[in-house]
Amino acid sequence: MFSKDTYISRRQELKKLVKSGVIILFGNNNSPCNFPNNGYYPFRQDSTFLYYFGQQRDGLVGVIDIDNDIETLVGDDIDLVDIVWYGSVDSVHDLAEQVGVHNSAPMKSLKTICNDAMSKKRKIHFLPPYRHDIKIQVFDLLGIHPNQQKDEASMDLI
């Protein structure tokens, strides 16, 4: 992992390039084999998420609200059952602080963030999803069918 300042600088540059709206960068989720905590493949984080948010944990989403200058790391803290599988891990708040993000929120808040932006007719920027679970998540959040997501993805991010 790079220094906190590296990630802060990268996100600042991204905000300058995109100029307005809300950027949503999805991290990867685990790829389970036959049980949610039985990862079939070694976990590999999405490269774009890793570049801007630096965290290797699954189930995270980075949100950059350019107009309000708010950055949020969204994800759920692990529960007692997960501790059996993963051991002790940092909270989402701690993961956010490690990369210079001052806000963290549970995954359920991502829908509220998206609904708020859409109700105000703000542009929501996202990259074309390549994994089926993220395509479903984009559909749930933004109402964009998986067959249309590549066309609806933000050219400013590509």
Regions found by a protein language model. Name each.
Residues M1-I158:
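A composition/biophysics-driven feature that prefers long, compositionally simple stretches
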